[in-house]
């Protein structure tokens, strides 16, 4: 099905789903959906609910403190950031995906690519899904940098998605035709498909029109038997520990008929709880934005004087 997006093989949808749920397993459900939750598990559920409801702006607002959110908006406008797109699944592939789907005759080209590579190849698709699943598991088992809990979660995620892909009707030509039509139609309704367009629109101005495309992408996965929104809405958890402004929660969610489990650290900042990883990532991003801003600013010696010319030191007596 990745053919519908980029004219490639079935691995694309499995990867899209894996990335979507890897991030999604970390998100949201509060009494007032516009306000950060005061309790760690509820904070994660609240973010997940915003994603399930295609509210990318609301998700972003719940992910970081208000003061940091404003700075991230500024960094976006200045071209130093595309957060939160960079932490969402397929964030780095979103613009190329939109560009491919918006090309003239995209539907016909993608359908021809599908017919050439996947149509009627159910056995080959199943074998490819199994092989990719096995490769992914072996890769994760030898990858350093994960905690045992993270490694176990990612392995279970890859195994579940590989199993789903083996049984999904990925090689069905009629289904692919409707999938391609849906994605091409949704992509053509997005206002921009390049870096300059995103920067000009601003963070909220970019996220809002992207939401319908994300909704269509999730609906396509659902039509192939992978309920992303169901998984997001199923997020539940328990508080394992709290030490000062740091907490650890165990989350569970249901994906393709299997219960998934993972542990996540959260940090309290300015009152509410946020994912520790998100705070660290955005802190680093803002530091880089500040450094880029400083590098682009003229030094005091280069700053123009009041008369409009470069300032020069007075002559020595």
Locate the predicted segments by residue.
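Bacterial N-terminal signal peptides that target proteins for export
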Residues: 2-14
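Bacterial N-terminal signal peptides
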Residues: 14-24
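Short, low-complexity N-terminal intrinsically disordered segments enriched in polar/charged residues
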Residues: 26-53, 61, 68-74, 78-116, ...
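Compositionally biased, proline/threonine/alanine/serine-rich low-complexity intrinsically disordered stretches
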Residues: 31, 288-317
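Short, well-ordered alpha-helical segments enriched in acidic and aromatic residues
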Residues: 55-70, 189, 193-200
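Short beta-strand edge/turn micro-motifs at domain boundaries
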Residues: 102-196, 205, 248, 259-292
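Acidic, glycine-rich loop-and-strand cores that form catalytic or ligand-binding grooves
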Residues: 192-222
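A short hydrophobic beta-strand element
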Residues: 243-251
């Amino acid at each position: 099905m990745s053919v519908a997006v980029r004219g490639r093989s079935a691995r694309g949808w499995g990867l899209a789903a894996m990335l979507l749920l890897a991030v999604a397993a970390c998100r949201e459900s509060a009494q007032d959906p516009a306000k950060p939750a005061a309790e760690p598990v509820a904070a994660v559920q609240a973010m997940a609910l915003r994603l399930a409801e295609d509210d990318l702006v609301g998700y972003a607002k719940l992910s970081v403190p208000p003061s940091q959110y404003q700075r991230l908006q500024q960094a976006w406008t200045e071209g130093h950031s595309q957060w939160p797109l960079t932490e969402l699944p397929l964030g780095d592939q979103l613009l190329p995906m939109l560009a491919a789907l918006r090309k003239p005759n995209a539907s016909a080209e993608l359908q021809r690519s599908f017919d050439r590579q996947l149509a009627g190849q159910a056995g080959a698709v199943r074998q490819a899904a199994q092989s990719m699943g096995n490769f992914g598991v072996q890769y994760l088992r030898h990858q350093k940098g994960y905690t045992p809990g993270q490694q176990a979660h990612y392995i279970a995620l890859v195994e579940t998605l590989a199993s789903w892909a083996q049984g999904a009707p990925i090689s069905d030509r009629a289904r692919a035709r409707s999938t391609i039509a849906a994605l091409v139609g949704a992509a053509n309704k997005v206002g921009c498909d390049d870096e300059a367009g995103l920067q000009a629109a601003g963070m909220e101005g970019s996220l809002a029109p992207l939401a319908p495309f994300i909704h269509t992408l999730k609906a396509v996965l659902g039509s192939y038997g992978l309920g992303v929104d169901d998984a997001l809405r199923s997020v539940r958890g328990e508080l394992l520990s709290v030490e000062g402004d740091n907490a650890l929660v165990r989350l569970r969610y249901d994906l393709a008929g299997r219960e998934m489990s993972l542990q996540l650290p959260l940090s309290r900042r300015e009152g509410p709880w946020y994912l520790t990883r998100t705070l660290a990532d955005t802190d680093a991003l803002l530091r880089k934005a500040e450094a880029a801003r400083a590098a682009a600013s003229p030094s005091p010696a280069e700053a123009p004087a009041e008369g409009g010319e470069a300032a020069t030191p007075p002559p020595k007596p």
